[in-house]
């Protein structure tokens, strides 16, 4: 009976988790099309995209898988949301990008608006994604694992990771 209740609880969380992952992906693509800036991870992903036949979504998925593997070796057991994040963010990025929904605006005001929209979408997406409490994304899981393993502050570990991928 307990397993059935857990499964029902898990299934009830899926729409919010998937919405959060979709919104996060839409925010990433919006910042990309603003042509005004991206997160260090997206800069890393675009560097790979520019030198391989991989799409941005595929690159995000492969990077996420590598990070999950690295995290596992330092003792971080990924949650269900971590694995779903790795797959679905990449899937949704490519889906949204191929849809042609976003276009780069011609004006600086339009570009700034799209960048701000993307940042807001990522912020709200994080809320939806974390609210279901099924685990952190691969990148945050790695950060949490390194903070515990190295006994260093979050700002230092997060900064070091993001500077490394730049």
Segments from the language model and where they lie:
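Core subunits and conserved enzymes of cellular information-processing
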Residues: 2-166
């Amino acid at each position: 009976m307990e397993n059935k209740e857990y499964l029902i609880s898990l299934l009830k969380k899926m729409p919010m988790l998937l919405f959060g992952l979709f919104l996060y992906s839409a925010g990433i693509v919006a910042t990309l099309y603003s042509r005004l800036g991206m997160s260090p991870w997206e800069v890393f992903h675009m560097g790979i995209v520019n030198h391989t036949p991989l799409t941005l979504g595929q690159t995000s998925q492969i990077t996420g898988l590598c990070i999950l593997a690295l995290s596992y070796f330092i003792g971080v057991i990924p949650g269900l949301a971590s694995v779903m994040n790795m797959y679905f963010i990449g899937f949704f990025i490519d889906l949204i990008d191929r849809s042609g929904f976003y276009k780069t605006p011609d004006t600086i005001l339009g570009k700034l608006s799209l960048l701000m929209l993307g940042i807001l979408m990522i912020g709200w997406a994080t809320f939806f994604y974390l609210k279901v409490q099924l685990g952190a994304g691969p990148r945050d899981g790695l950060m949490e694992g390194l903070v515990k393993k190295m006994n260093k502050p979050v700002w230092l570990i997060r900064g070091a990771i993001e500077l490394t991928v730049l």
